[in-house]
Amino acid sequence: MNPSVSGSLRNKLRRCQTKDAYRFLKKIRRHEKSKSPKKELAKQYSELSALMANSIAIAESKEHLIPNPITYPKGLPVSAKAAEIRGLLENNQVIIVSGDTGSGKTTQLPKICLDAGYGRRGLIGHCQPRRLAATSVASRIAEELNSPIGALVGFQVRFNERISESCCVKLMTDGILLSEIQSDAYLSKYEVIIVDEAHERSLLSLIHI
């Protein structure tokens, strides 16, 4: 494959959905080593380019669903620290946020992640220890973002799911995420994982961490 063509495809990877990026990278590497005739390589390039364009379009289509600006309830300690937390997210792979009950961690952290640019290429996963918490928190965040449940914010628990392709934030129980790890060890569909109530130190939350 022509180096300029290869470079063009690699540059597009950072705009593709995270769940597609590794698969596309493997295809690019395979094409780079291919000894196929130029005509066949051109066909392969065209097909891969179309797949990548579709993945990019899906990621970019989420942008119009996200409120601009994202607002935070006044009076919550986490709201007052939103800019600081956003900066930490942008510069660290792992952060720990500690605060009193009612400080806004559960409902505001996913919004801060959205504000930091996450949730477009991959989901913001938000783990809760119980099914009721997952569904109620999803409804609350969706309400604050003025979005119907299942559109921008969705949830998945045992026997119940409200998720669409447009979702940026996914609430779930620890068990759901653990089951996904079995089929996707890298959790490639997620850009961010929030483990709430981590202080409970269940076996599942320890595995996630």
Residue ranges of predicted features:
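Inter-Walker segment of RecA-like/P-loop motor cores
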Residues: 142-180
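Walker A/P-loop NTP-binding motif
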Residues: 107-119
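Walker A/P-loop
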Residues: 93-109
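Conserved small/polar residues in nucleotide/adenosyl-binding loops
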Residues: 207-209
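Short basic/glycine-enriched coil/helix segment immediately N-terminal to the Walker B
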Residues: 164-166, 181-192
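Helicase-associated low-complexity/disordered flanking segments
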Residues: 1-86, 91
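Pre-Walker A (Motif I) flank of P-loop NTPase domains
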Residues: 91-95, 122-123
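Conserved Walker A/P-loop ATP-binding site and its immediately adjacent core
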Residues: 123-141
